[in-house]
Amino acid sequence: MKKYLIFFSLIILCSCNHLAGQEIRSNELIKTTKWWTVQFPGKPQKDENAKLMSLIKVKGNRFVNSNGDTVLFRGLAIADPDKLENEGEWSKELFQRVKEMGATLVRIPVHPVAWRQRTPEKYLELLDQAIGWCTEMRMYVIIDWHSIGNLKAGLFQDPMYITSLTETFDFWRTIARHFNGHNTVAFYEIFNEPTLYFGQLGSMTWDEWKKINEDVIKLIRAFDKETIPLVAGFDWAYDLTPLNYDPVNAEGIGYVSHPYPHKRTQPWVPKWEEDFGFAAGKYPVFATEFGFTLGKSTMADNGEYGKTIIKYLEERGISWAWWVFDPAWEPKMFESWNDHTLTDNGKFFKEAAHGFPK
């Protein structure tokens, strides 16, 4: 009982801190004799290279470039830029290493706690650097609002994921306004992993979740009519079965699945097809996060899964992004910042991203 009391106390404390943080930030904005001049962060970015890369669009069930050619992304997630900068590892060299791994896209996870603590103004500076480096190296970008939980109930898996509907709307207003027209930023992943955690995070129906996403998309489109919103399903962004009867009412979007190996037992393929793969016949689908099993990240434990999932995704025309290019976050892809020795998880991605030996 004591453990649960501590857990709920932490949630209440973090929620109060979140609300207090919003109030403090609001007060800081008006601590000026010319308070009427204060504006919200995220004014449109001015980047002469914004159109350097081809604009990615949705055409039927595919992502295509400006020539109409189908694009299948092989992406790689980095850790949160705030974490990396605090550790002294935020640099152009990091993105060069990601490029060398074979990635054509970088997924950037923005945690709500980091967004608040650094402040949106300062966090945008990190994102601007990332977009600049990715443009130079010809890698596209997903900006991911990296929360896990029930956005409707306001209950989340861990304190770092605590956010609110208001903050989520404000985040996407800020991001869409700032990166509108920048072709490198191809995708906005609206919410990382919606989950009810077997009822421990309250209740939310698909219809309620669909409506939240539709409202976010409308807000994004008020500022940015080109970048592609990505919508996740329940079960930690794995399950897309509601698309069978009630897809999101929006054009030019994609859907997300996170098909980690623990989600289903063998035989995998028919279960993947039933749970999310079927959707790729009608809509663009992007497996934006998965990797080797947590705590068992060896080829011996994951080799068969790895080759099977990549083969399945690519035959289905589903773009994918591996998790995570970091030596601390699991499943890690290299051992340390000192020597960058790849783990089996890292070696596998590099081989897969380069198309496997023929």
Tell where the protein language model's regions lie, with residue ranges.
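NAD(P)H-binding glycine-rich loop region in Rossmannoid oxidoreductase-like domains
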Residues: 108
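Extracellular glycoside hydrolase catalytic/binding regions
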Residues: 55, 87, 160, 166-187, ...
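N-terminal carbohydrate-binding accessory modules
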Residues: 21-105, 234, 278, 351-355
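Acidic/histidine-rich helix-loop elements
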Residues: 71-94, 115-119, 156-160, 262-265, ...
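An active-site-proximal structural segment forming one wall of the substrate-binding cleft
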Residues: 86-105, 116-147, 153-190, 209-221
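Sec-dependent N-terminal signal peptides
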Residues: 4-13
